[in-house]
A protein has these predicted regions:
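Fe-S-dependent hydro-lyases/dehydratases of central metabolism
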Residues: 1-224
Length: 224
């Protein structure tokens, strides 16, 4: 039996499946600069007591990350409040409250460190649709796939530098998502100019089904 008042245990609800639409004009929650480990994404320590409560532990999401758009670790700029500094998970919750999905931009070996599954579950819970990086740590990339987040890598690593704070990102032609087929990503700048870049993925046919179902567990449930 679980008590609703518990702040350590809560039932998990299945993540929603992909709705069949492209990801259009996603805001950038974070542009991670340099090393971003699973501990930067989901810190341990005092937070471990909330491992059984996804909503509670999600309050630590990316609080250890260095954001290229902020001078304060774990912070970003709040577009809902004149770009004032705000903790990254607090902005994620504002997006969540307004039904706005978002993405993350990352540097090299994104998600290195311990194989912390919460480092994928928390962003997914808060509304992350995709993460685009120069390169992934293998286990973190696998965990993102399992929980329905689209993990992409820049075809040209220098495209990381093109991403600006107020950009909106669109990932298009998702209905054509297939093994070994790169995806087109459109960067829309605040001045109404745009650039199109190419991103790669390593999704297998089975993992593409995970993405469409919303998670690996959802896909498994569909087979029962």
């Amino acid at each position: 039996m679980l008590f609703r008042s518990s702040d350590r245990l809560a039932l998990l609800k299945p993540f929603l499946p992909w709705d069949g639409n492209d990801f259009i004009d996603l805001p950038i929650l974070l542009k991670a600069k340099g090393k971003c480990t699973t501990d930067h994404i989901s810190q341990a320590g005092i937070w471990l007591k909330y491992r059984g409560h996804l909503d509670k532990i999600s309050n630590n999401t990316y609080i250890g990350a260095i954001n290229a758009f902020s001078e304060l670790p774990g912070h970003t700029n709040d577009p809902f409040d004149n770009n004032k500094p705000i903790l990254i998970p607090e902005l994620a919750r504002k997006y969540m409250k307004n039904n706005i999905s978002w993405l993350v931009i990352g540097d090299e070996n994104f998600g290195e460190g311990s194989s912390r599954e919460h480092a994928a579950m928390q962003p997914r819970y808060l509304g992350c649709k995709a993460i685009i990086v120069r390169s992934f740590a293998r286990i973190h990339e696998a965990n993102l796939k399992k929980h329905g987040i689209l993990p992409l890598t820049f075809f040209n690593p220098k495209d990381y530098e093109k991403i600006l704070a107020d950009d909106k990102i669109s990932i298009v032609n998702l209905h054509q998502l297939a093994e070994n087929l790169p995806l087109k990503v459109i960067i829309k700048h605040k001045n109404n100019t745009s650039e199109t870049i190419v991103c790669n993925h390593s999704l297998s046919e089975v993992q593409i089904n995970w993405f469409k179902a919303g998670s690996a567990l959802n896909a498994l449930a569909q087979e029962i």
